């Protein structure tokens, strides 16, 4: 029997380890042999659990964020973390800020890794040297943050069997959906980036329309959909359900935009919309 992991081998924003056991209960409703399509594959945890419990099922894992590439580089990432761990030693207590010359040495080592190999797993690295749940994707962005000694005491296991048996694709979720939507009994696993949360580590830009487009895949299909109380998507859908005749109140209006700057690296766009109804 294959080993089943209840958390992803490498850090990933929004992996569903806290819901793993509840998700397993949902899977019990479906026979082995059902087609499962993980539209937003993320860390692959949902796909992995599904394949572990339903070994005769086809499980399609949409690895749009290239998680498998990060896993392939675990030995390289472990070596980089080991070098940083040795640099820090006992000079900085756990979870305290890394400052001064040591901070610069760490950045130099990361830059050396990127220049010599062409790759650094910045998400995994962020979890070891940035404040909890902060993730940056370049040395340039990391330099804007304080470094912390959150470095793992041991390397990450390679988990070579984690994605075993999955049918792996890497494309827009709409394309994956359209390929499989007419297959009888298909179950869609739908775990999009959450509305009103940071999507900076995802490989695509998301706006409000993108979040709402996802809801199209739910109608008429079996699904397991994930969200959180940090997202307002359920509240929005409930409101729309109660106000079905509203339509678009901003249709044919005029929009004026103004770029507002809060500080040197933060800005937003103020908008004014107006329309004069005929008398």
Question: What are these language model-derived features?
Answer:
Residues 148-153, 204-214:
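Well-ordered, non-membrane alpha-helical segments in soluble/globular domains
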């Amino acid at each position: 029997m294959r080993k089943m992991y209840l958390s992803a081998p490498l850090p990933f924003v929004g992996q569903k380890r806290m819901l793993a056991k509840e998700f397993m209960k949902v899977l019990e409703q479906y026979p082995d042999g059902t087609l499962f399509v993980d539209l937003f594959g993320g860390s692959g945890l949902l796909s992995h659990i599904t394949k572990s419990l339903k070994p005769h099922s086809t499980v399609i894992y949409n690895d749009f964020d290239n998680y498998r590439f990060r896993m392939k580089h675990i030995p390289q990432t472990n070596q980089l973390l080991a070098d940083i761990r040795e640099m820090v030693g006992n000079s900085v207590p756990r979870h305290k800020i890394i400052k001064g010359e040591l901070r610069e040495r760490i950045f130099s080592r990361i830059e050396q890794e990127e220049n010599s190999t062409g790759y650094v797993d910045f998400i995994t690295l962020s979890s070891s040297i940035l404040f909890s749940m902060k993730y940056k994707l370049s040395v340039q962005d990391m330099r804007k943050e304080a470094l912390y000694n959150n470095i793992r005491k041991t390397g990450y296991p390679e988990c070579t069997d984690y994605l075993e048996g999955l049918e792996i694709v890497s494309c827009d979720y709409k394309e994956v959906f359209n390929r499989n939507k007419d297959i009888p009994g298909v179950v869609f696993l739908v775990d999009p980036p959450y509305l009103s949360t940071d999507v900076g580590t995802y490989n695509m830009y998301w706006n409000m329309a993108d979040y709402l487009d996802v809801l199209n895949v739910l109608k008429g299909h079996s699904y397991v959909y994930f969200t959180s109380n940090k997202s307002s998507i359920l509240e929005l859908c409930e409101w729309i359900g109660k106000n079905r005749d509203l339509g678009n109140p901003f249709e044919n209006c005029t929009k004026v935009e103004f770029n507002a700057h809060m500080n040197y690296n933060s800005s937003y766009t103020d908008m004014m919309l107006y329309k004069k109804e005929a008398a």
